[in-house]
Amino acid sequence: MNPRRKKRLLITSLLAVALSLAVGLVLFALQQNIDLFYTPTEIIEGKKETGIKPEVGQRLRIGGMVVQGSVKRNPESLKVSFDLVDNGGGIVTVFFDGILPDLFREGQGIVAQGNLLNATEINASEVLAKHDEEYMPPEVSEALVGMDNFKANNK
């Protein structure tokens, strides 16, 4: 192999390694921003298709209906905890330190974003409630079909 071809091969190899490294770093950085959606039953039992459960400490979004009588507020601070349930019967406790949305109520569908503390507890950094009487995110709507106080025609 002549020196000119060796130089081209070396430069091409270095560019391929640099590109691979750059792609790897970008994917690693984006991994921090991925929030997978789960229902309470999926957190406890795993996803239906794969059986994969979220890991402790993983960032995620959870959607479900707030259980009647489960909201507990700390009178000294903004801390609140409540239970979420879906049609699969799984119940997950959500802890939140902040101001809840005005539309947050017991018996209402919500989505909470946060970190998984253990198999049945979430530390939420954000709680989202329906913005009007008709709208519900499709994932939450599917998870709540069949519940007593949920209308399947919510869209």
Curated annotation (Swiss-Prot):
GO terms for biological process: cytochrome complex assembly. The chain crosses the membrane at residues 9-29. HAMAP family: CcmE. It comes from Psychromonas ingrahamii (strain DSM 17664 / CCUG 51855 / 37). Keywords: Cell inner membrane, Cell membrane, Cytochrome c-type biogenesis, Heme, Iron, Membrane, Metal-binding, Signal-anchor, Transmembrane, Transmembrane helix. This is Cytochrome c-type biogenesis protein CcmE. InterPro entries: CcmE, CcmE-like_sf, NA-bd_OB-fold. NCBIfam families: PRK13165.1, PRK13254.1-1. GO terms for molecular function: heme binding; metal ion binding. Residues 1-8 are cytoplasmic. Gene3D superfamilies: Nucleic acid-binding proteins (2.40.50.140). It is a single-pass type II membrane protein. Belongs to the CcmE/CycJ family. Heme binds at residues 131, 135. GO terms for cellular component: plasma membrane. It comes from the Bacteria. Heme chaperone required for the biogenesis of c-type cytochromes. Transiently binds heme delivered by CcmC and transfers the heme to apo-cytochromes in a process facilitated by CcmF and CcmH. SUPFAM superfamilies: Heme chaperone CcmE (SSF82093). Residues 30-155 are periplasmic. The keyword Membrane applies. The gene is ccmE. It is found in: Cell inner membrane. The keyword Protein biosynthesis does not apply.
